[in-house]
Amino acid sequence: MIERTFVGENVSETLIDEYFKTKLVRAGYSHIDLKKTPIGTRITVFAEKPGFVIGRKGKMVKELTETLAKEYAVKNPQIEVKQVENPDLDPAIVGHKIASSLERGMHFRRTAHSAIRRVMGSGAKGVSIIVSGKLSGERSRTEKFMDGYMKHCGEPAEALVNKSHQLAKLKLGVVGVTVKIMKPDVTLPDEITILSGEIKEVTEYSEASQE
């Protein structure tokens, strides 16, 4: 019963995330943090432009609240909006900008390289961008772009790398955009830090010196 409830909550959060992703395109939507409280459900929305989430005179946030209660059966939803501190270190926002550029007809290589420069310029330890689909012809293919240091497997890849998957709808078909970012403050398991300090001379002690 507990497992079924847990799965149900995860499915619900995923559906809400997808709803916000389509509804808050102009806001530069990143992700949500959903927590249940004794009086209801607190949903924190992280976005590049919080003003678009709130809307004019609070119209948008009111619409979102009503939709969550009616269509997603969220108990007494309370929406809080927070601004993403550095959009160029957020894989969801970076991926969305790449997808939007592709939909406007920008070349995928130019778009990817431009995104990588912004991410690395913001201090990221590493970034990986994968674009897959019908990019310039009838045949589907995958193009990978990377800079810096990146963990691709194991526990470090799960714990230290933030990733997001976005879709771009082009005339030739749907193109997938996967962005992985390793942020500046990440400490790797094999990373060694040498502390600077005063070096003191140690005099060797022995019983002979006492005699």
From Swiss-Prot:
Domain of life: Archaea
CDD domains (alphabetical): KH-II_30S_S3_arch
GO biological process: translation
NCBIfam families: PRK04191.1, uS3_euk_arch
GO CC terms of this entry: cytosolic small ribosomal subunit
Function field: Binds the lower part of the 30S subunit head.
Gene3D superfamilies the UniProt entry points to: 3.30.300.20, Ribosomal protein S3, C-terminal domain (3.30.1140.32)
UniProt keyword annotation of Lipid metabolism present: no
InterPro entries linked to this entry: KH_dom, KH_dom-like_a/b, KH_dom_type_2, KH_sf_prok-type, Ribosomal_S3_C_sf, Ribosomal_uS3_arc, Ribosomal_uS3_C, Ribosomal_uS3_CS
Domain KH type-2: 16-85
GO molecular function per UniProt: rRNA binding; structural constituent of ribosome
Family: Belongs to the universal ribosomal protein uS3 family.
Protein name: Small ribosomal subunit protein uS3
Record text on subunit structure and interactions: Part of the 30S ribosomal subunit.
Keyword Ribosomal protein: yes
Pfam families reported for this sequence: KH_2, Ribosomal_S3_C
Keyword terms of this UniProt record: Ribonucleoprotein, Ribosomal protein, RNA-binding, rRNA-binding
